[in-house]
Each structure stands twice: as C-alpha cells, then as structure tokens.
Amino acid sequence: MLYRKPITVCLASCSVQETHGSACDVSSIAYDSRAVREGSVFFALRGTHAHGAQYIHAAIDAGACAIVHDCPLDTYVVGVYYARVPDARCALSSAAAAFYDFPTRALTVIGVTGTEGKSSTVSFIAQLLRLCGKRVGFISTVEYSLGDDILPNAEHQTTPESLTVQRLLAEMREHSCEFAVIEASSHGLSTRTARLQDVAFDVAVCMNVRHEHLEFHGSFEQYRFDKANVFRALDAHDHIKDGRRVPSFGVLWAEDASAVYFREATHKPCFFFKRGTGAEQRTAACLERMPCTLLWVQTLPQISQALRLRFVLSTVQEPAQPAQDGAHDVSVPLEGAFNACNIAASFLVLHGLLGTSLAAFAQHVQYVQPIQGRMQRVDMGQDFEVLIDYAHTPSSFEEILPPLAARVRARKRRMLVLFGSAGERDTQKRAMQGAIASRYAHVIVLTDEDPRGEDPMGILCMIAAGCEHKKLGKTLFLIPDRVAALRHIFSLARAQDLVLLLGKGHEHSIIYAHTVQPYDEERTARELLRASLSSDTLLS
C-alpha cells in the first residue's frame, strides 16, 4: 500500500520549535540518507559515531523535500521544508505512527520483555494464537511475520527502529491480522531510542530481569526502569481497537526479584506463573495484591525429547485458600527445562485474551515448534551430540549449563563449550561467563561473537580471566576465528560427548570493526561435521 501525507500531519503531535520553508506532502520517511527517494522526509538522528545532520545535503540531493532535525543548522536550502524538534528520534516515532495511520489502533498488541526467553515466548504466543484460529503477526530477534510467511530477521537489533516497527505493524493490519506480538528489548523501550514509543500495548509480559546491557543503560536500576515502560504503556490508552474493547493485563514470573516492581508499574491486573506443584505456601511478595491469578508449573521427568509439564491454575483470594483448577499435564516438543516458563507465560496470555482453558491449551501446545538457534540439535551422523543456543549472558549460562552438565555426568562423558562475548557491550559479564562455564564444562573454546571495534583477542582474554582451573592449551583454547574454533572443538569431541555452541544462535553474521562477515552457525557446523565424517570414511 502506498502512503502520502502532509508533513504537518506527520508532525502534528511533535513539539515543533521552528520551521523554514513551505510545508509539503511526503511519500516516504527515512533516517538513512541512502534510503531517501523523491518526496521523502529525512530525520537527522544522533548516532553512536555520527550525527545525521552530516547527511542532510546528501538526503536533499537524493530527493528529500523535508528535513526534521534537533540541532542548529547553518544553512537552509530553498524549496525544502525544515522542522526543528527537541528530539528527532521521538519525532520519528510519532511521525511514523501518523504516516502509517496508527496501526496499533487496529491490533491487539502483546509486548514481551525480559533478559532471557523473549524470542521463544514471542514465537510460542504467536504459534498458539494461530493454533486457536487467529490471524497474528510478530516481530522478534530471530524472525518476523506479517500474518502468513515467517521470515528471518537479518538485523542484529531485537527491536527495530520505530519507522520499521510502524511499517511492519501497518503491513500486519493490511494482512488482516488481529494480534501483533512484539519482542520489546530494553533498548527499544528506552526513551533514548523511542522505538516503541507510539505502540499502543494491550498486554505486557516480563519473563525475568537479570544483569545485561549496562553499557547502554548505565545501571541496573535504569535497565529495569526502561523495561518496565511496557507495563506503564498499558495505562496510556483506552484499549479500544477497531471499536472493540480488548483485555489489558500484565504477565509476570512470581519468583523474579523485580516482579513487585513491574506489578506496581501498571494499574492493570497482573497474572503470575511460578515453579512448583501448587501445594506450597504463598511466599512471593508480588502476590499480595489479591485476588490474583497464579499458574503453577512443574517439570516432569522427560520422555524422549519432549518437555513434560504439569500446570495448576489458581485464583488466590487469600493466602491460605487458593481456588485451584486441578492439574493438567502437557507435552511440548522442546528441549530445555527453561522453556517451562516460556510456555507458562504463553498460556497466561491466551487465558487472559481468549479465556483459553488448560484443557484446550494442552491440545494446542503439543504442536508448538522450537525456533532457530535455541537448543537446536545438529546431527550429521557424528558419534557426539551438538547443540546450538543463543545463550550469551551469565544468567542464560546458569539456566542451561547445569541440567546439561548433569545429563553428561550421568552417562560419564564430557561437555565441551564454545562461546565468546560481544564487543562494545557490557564488559562486566565477560569474566562471569568464563567462571560459570568453567564450573560445568570440561573443555572451553573461546572465540569471536561480535567483536565490533574491540580487539578480538582482548575480549577472549577478559573471558579467560574467569576460567579458573582451566589449563591453556589443554582444557582452555582461545581461537578468535569462529570457523577454526568450531573445527577445533569438533576435533576434541569423543563418542557420547556434548558439544555446545553458544552465543550466535540464529544470527547470520559476525560484526568486526570495519566489516560484517557472513556467518551461519548451523550451516558451518553441518559443513564441518560432514567434512570430518567424509575424511574419517576415507581413512577407514
């Protein structure tokens, strides 16, 4: 669909401080001068390494008829409309929403935040809504959908810029979607980026809050505050979508230390999930506001490769007398006990929006599929196990490594782990990652993740500082080249060992200072294993 709007309509909700030139109609919006075409409005955004004001003349040469900026300009080109605003990023979000006719006014929007589990939970919610017969689109780190096909997300951004968010939401509306599920990162929820500023959220989900992204937020408190913006957003509008009122609520993990903080960020009701059998006494402080809905989730002994869970749904009227809906067992074709919380949160979203019962949910959830790069098995016929996972934080290491290590110990074999840490990101977590991996892995291979502008070997040395009791060249290897690192860890693996490839997951590139190298972890692993098996066959 083609859009065209007067620039004054796009900027109607922005605090325009001054203008130069005559207003015009715009046919597209751009914040990258290379994307400008005839009739575009160009937003000059402040970036990490440069300011968009440097590219205003390039944008005009490419056909921009309007410029939105937040800094003083020395010259103004005749025939071009200029609008100065306090913050060009905030203005971009508002203008994009207006340009695309406010798409979230027609969509029931579910925002999923948290340090771990966002992408999987977004995917599970979208899959389950579809299994209930609903038209749904979604945006996540791994992939996105406008209602039909699922497409890979080629960017390294969890939440895209506001212009992309509004465009994708508009396309979901055009594809007759009723629901949109958005992975809401702390960056995207920050007022500094304003990427989700003009999204009318109806449901907010927070999986957990752990140590991450302090290089951007500056402190854990600011990190938590920014994440809670998705809960504050629930109180910002009336939840009337295309003339119908939709339910609005929050979903929280009762055991998380920040659950009370997030519950108090909204006046809307919150549903909770908690690990246990349902027989335990209520202990979570977040449950003090009653009545409240509480879902107990218990992990049952695994059969084959399916995750088996027992759910008990309670309505807590008072601490001693919760009303329970009986126990329901479900089987989900997923790896990893951590997915229990992701599935529990997904149920509460469906329960709150559609009134889905546990019995109906049990019928649907057996068809849920894992997403790429999350506990993904690679089997080329080798005699050892290979798993790929996106885990790249200390908390995600603590979540996945202990149960895998226990599984390996039970068969008296070894766990070999390959990972790195992103450059120009939180440096405090690097030694922590090394220390956690050292506790559970027999062999560690450190390699590039996304070094960006940092020295790759310098990053690996910072991780290695936490790898106590590992001997360099014996049980600890520093190999920046990721392909070479994979080749080496496969060469070390013995029969029945477990090889974990962490950090890249679904991503399709490695970012260096001056280049972006195409890279696919699954494809690379398959090619190396295939070559190794062919070589072994020839030698035998």
Curated annotation (Swiss-Prot):
Its EC number is 6.3.2.-. It comes from the Bacteria. Carboxylation is probably crucial for Mg(2+) binding and, consequently, for the gamma-phosphate positioning of ATP. Transmembrane segments: none annotated. Pfam families: Mur_ligase, Mur_ligase_C, Mur_ligase_M. One of its GO terms (molecular function) is acid-amino acid ligase activity. Pathway: Cell wall biogenesis; peptidoglycan biosynthesis. It is an enzyme of class 6 (ligase). Keywords: ATP-binding, Cell cycle, Cell division, Cell shape, Cell wall biogenesis/degradation, Cytoplasm, Ligase, Nucleotide-binding, Peptidoglycan synthesis. ATP binds at residues 114-120. The modification N6-carboxylysine is found at residue 227. UDP-N-acetyl-alpha-D-muramoyl-L-alanyl-D-glutamate binds at residues 33, 158-159, 185, 195. One of its GO terms (biological process) is cell wall organization. Gene3D superfamilies: Mur ligase, C-terminal domain (3.90.190.20), Mur-like, catalytic domain (3.40.1190.10), MurE/MurF, N-terminal domain (3.40.1390.10). It is found in: Cytoplasm. One of its GO terms (cellular component) is cytoplasm. Belongs to the MurCDEF family. MurE subfamily. Catalyzes the addition of an amino acid to the nucleotide precursor UDP-N-acetylmuramoyl-L-alanyl-D-glutamate (UMAG) in the biosynthesis of bacterial cell-wall peptidoglycan. PANTHER family: MUR LIGASE FAMILY MEMBER, UDP-N-ACETYLMURAMOYL-L-ALANYL-D-GLUTAMATE--2,6-DIAMINOPIMELATE LIGASE MURE HOMOLOG, CHLOROPLASTIC. This is UDP-N-acetylmuramyl-tripeptide synthetase.
